[in-house]
Amino acid sequence: MNLYLSIRIVVICVVGLFTMPMAHALSLGDIKIKSALNDPLDAEITVHSTDAGEILNANIRLASQDVHDRAGLEITRHHLRMQFKPITTGKGKFAIQVTTERPVSEPVLEFIIEVTGGSSNLIRGYAVHLDPPNL
């Protein structure tokens, strides 16, 4: 390979790197439960994102009945009361706050959420195990 061709390939690669659109990766992590059985649900889902606007402006909701059906999960009254809100947890970290206004009486709550925003469209399932409150 001659020198001219080598330089040309390097220039094309470098220009390609600078002209590519930046990909902002968004992924969902584990869920942390802060409430007990027979209390209103209070949980946080860890969010990994390189773009604050992507998660803070995302549309977060319970996935459709069809998605739950395909996963073999039933949507109950507790699911319909769930609220999802993107929050900042400090030091540039983000989470999705999952809450209900009314107490959850089921010890296991399985659900699928859908997050759409920017270039991301994520669907992920979670299983929440609620322990009785400590006496």
Residue ranges with predicted function:
Residues 1-135:
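Extracytoplasmic/periplasmic low-complexity
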